[in-house]
Amino acid sequence: MSKTLKIIQKKKSLEKELYTRKKKLKKLKKLGFNFPNTFHYIHTIKEIKKLYNNYTKKELEKINYKTKISGRIVNKRTFGKALFFVIRNNNHDIQIYIKSNYFPKNYYQKNILELDLGDIIGVKGKIFKTNTCELSILCKKIYLLTKSLRSLPDKYFGLKNQEIKYRKRYLDLISNNKIIKIFQKRSLIISNIRSFMKQKKFLEVETPMLHPIPGGANAKPFITYHNSLNEKMYLRIAPELYLKKLIIGGFNKIFEINRNFRNEGISTKHNPEFTMMEIYMSYSNYIDIMNLLEELCIFLVKKISKSLIIMYKSKKINFKKPIKKMTMIESILKFNKNIDISNFKNIKNIKKTATNLNIKIDSNASLGEITNLIFEKTTEKKIIQPTFITEYPIEISPLAKEKNKYFAERFEFFIAGYEIANGFSELNDPEEQKKRFKLQISKKNYTDKSKNFSYDKDYIIALEHGLPPTSGLGVGIDRLIMILTNQKTIKDIIFFPLLKKI
């Protein structure tokens, strides 16, 4: 049978199933069924297993404990005059044992036997163990709470099509306990991040998602329009400038965990809508915030894996303290034996090196910009173990304090070939910041003459009131979770990743 024919037959089968179930619902509604919401469970399935799993069959018979539970039917089988359901609730399953002679014959045949996979039910009954010692519920009463009109994915094989998993995440969650555990772990990681920040006396804040000027990072914004104000607005690329205004206002230690939006490509490590944490700490520098990040990562790894070693894509990732530190140029030389330190001496040498490596560069690119391009193209993916890369060129660090005329007090943090975080000592000289903004804008306007770029002048005014010595850090929460949960793509740790319309 051809693949196309199989798809057609499958579609017809699903349409027939939908029709049959709609007929059942129509009959139920005539009998007064209205998707009731008055059933309340006494225990969750997880609670029942925790409380009674260690009891023997005889002990449970002696206790004779009754309960009420609810869940979705995910398995159904008959055995003689008995019927067995497996119901699922919040990633936990339990067997329901239904004896036909406990119910009027007509009710059993027309109501209980007619229940389908996917239906959501409430059950009142006694907790017991079968002869094979499986914890179960002996059903005394059963309540249909929600009629499922569409059939569920196959119990054993689940969803095979990866794109359907992303487009119809609810089906993936129903049929795949593993994916539920990943998202539960995501929630746990974010909770632990908040707990850590609270321990360190940081205040969680919220800043605007709609910005009048696109700023905070060098990326394309999503553009929208505010009807009442009659103004173009931008979904935030980064909250950086607003957060630093709060530091100017007097807060010492703040952080924000929220969404950023960048109107750019989609890949295994990029989603246009993503979760970031930004941290700002006054009276500190980039070394201080680097140490804070090291402490946070070790804290999270211990919480998740109970050790300092995790597996990612079959590689052991070791978070042993101290985490390795290298300058950008040191890392390029380490991972590319064909490149020599002399290549970075002047613009002529660096351009020749880039050409030899087939790296496209702009004719006006500076020494630092080309060095960064070489790093991105030849080195990033090779940094597997947790590593802080320092001494970023000043030309690509417009908001960072200078270390010297070549480098900024800046670092990026890499794990498994992914950039996880970016931190630096904040530039707090308003005149220098204004100068850098203007240079950045002139480059943008030169590159794209169709647009008239501008910068946040209010931020400069705020700086003129005085920003204390401050360090800042941005952490890509999604990428960090990818690594801590051993997932190959960012789509696997976002409930509803952005996909093209079909």
From Swiss-Prot:
Q: Which InterPro entries match?
A: Aa-tRNA-synt_II, aa-tRNA-synth_II, aa-tRNA-synth_II/BPL/LPL, Lys-tRNA-ligase_II, Lys-tRNA-ligase_II_N, Lys-tRNA-synth_II_C, NA-bd_OB-fold, NA-bd_OB_tRNA
Q: Name one GO molecular function term.
A: magnesium ion binding
Which family does the record claim for this protein?
Belongs to the class-II aminoacyl-tRNA synthetase family.
GO biological process entries: lysyl-tRNA aminoacylation
Which E.C. number(s) belong to this protein? Answer: 6.1.1.6
UniProt-annotated binding residues for Mg(2+) 2: E419
Per UniProt, where does Mg(2+) 1 bind? E412, E419
Query: Cofactor(s) for this protein?
Result: Mg(2+)
User: Cross-referenced NCBIfam families, in alphabetical order?
Assistant: lysS_bact, PRK00484.1
Its localization reads:
Cytoplasm
Q: What is this protein called?
A: Lysine--tRNA ligase
Q: Which PROSITE patterns is this protein grouped with? A: AA_TRNA_LIGASE_II (PS50862)
- Say where the protein is mainly found: cytoplasm
Q: Which Pfam families match?
A: tRNA-synt_2, tRNA_anti-codon
GO CC term (a single one): cytosol
Asked whether the keyword Nucleotide-binding is assigned, the reply is yes
From the UniProt record, list the reaction(s) this protein catalyses. Answer: tRNA(Lys) + L-lysine + ATP = L-lysyl-tRNA(Lys) + AMP + diphosphate
Do the record's keywords include Manganese?
no
Q: How is the cofactor bound?
A: Binds 3 Mg(2+) ions per subunit.
State the organism named in the record: Buchnera aphidicola subsp. Cinara cedri (strain Cc)
UniProt keywords (A-Z) are: Aminoacyl-tRNA synthetase, ATP-binding, Cytoplasm, Ligase, Magnesium, Metal-binding, Nucleotide-binding, Protein biosynthesis
